[in-house]
Amino acid sequence: MIKNGELKPGDKLDSVQALAESFQVSRSAVREALSALKAMGLVEMKQGEGTYLKEFELNQISQPLSAALLMKKEDVKQLLEVRKLLEIGVASLAAEKRTEADLERIQDALKEMGSIEADGELGEKADFAFHLALADASQNELLKHLMNHVSSLLLETMRETRKIWLFSKKTSVQRLYEEHERIYNAVAAGNGAQAEAAMLAHLTNVEDVLSGYFEENVQ
């Protein structure tokens, strides 16, 4: 599994129940996330056997899908669920395997987030850089490419929804900074469990805010 740094093409994923328990989400959320990964061509569901990571070239997933697809509320919801399943593992691995150079890159992105509170676009880019730096710190090449793919999709969606108060109000930007700071501190301390918890809290908050936006603004 991703959490242990052992995910590779051909591996069988844990059961829906096991994934739900591991990442503290509902079974329906796991099923939706797996369906999104299947749509991306990253996993294969075999009847009566389970779900397997597909064999593919890393460069096949280097380009994001069309942002237009993601403007539907349900698509964004599924993307965020996929991120939750992936990035909790990323945080744990980063805490275990990060180098000093990795920590410096993560901290640089964090500092940039804290210094440009009034600029939503640059804030999005710094947020993006923070999460990709965490993925780099996992020292898992496949996981880094998976994260780059999913995060690129999210960044495109963010650019299309700049009115979201998450990136337009100083108070919410400060909250985001503090959430990322907690993730960084846990990774720097080498505390995998704390890093997982901080990432889960962050992504749950992002999910709640974006869901609220789509409820109010997108039919």
From Swiss-Prot:
Keywords: DNA-binding, Repressor, Transcription, Transcription regulation. Residues 1-56 form the HTH gntR-type domain. Residues 16-35 bind DNA. Gene3D superfamilies: GntR ligand-binding domain-like, Winged helix-like DNA-binding domain superfamily/Winged helix DNA-binding domain. Disruption phenotype: Cells lacking this gene show a derepression of lutABC expression. They are also defective in bacilysin production. InterPro entries: GntR_C (IPR011711), TF_FadR/GntR_C (IPR008920), Tscrpt_reg_HTH_GntR (IPR000524), WH-like_DNA-bd_sf (IPR036388), WH_DNA-bd_sf (IPR036390). SUPFAM superfamilies: GntR ligand-binding domain-like, Winged helix' DNA-binding domain. GO terms for molecular function: DNA binding; DNA-binding transcription factor activity. CDD domains: WHTH_GntR. Coiled coil: none annotated. Negatively regulates the transcription of the lutABC operon, which is required for L-lactate utilization. LutR activity is regulated by lactate, since presence of L-lactate, that probably binds to LutR, leads to derepression of the operon. Also appears to be essential for bacilysin biosynthesis. This is HTH-type transcriptional regulator LutR. It comes from Bacillus subtilis (strain 168).
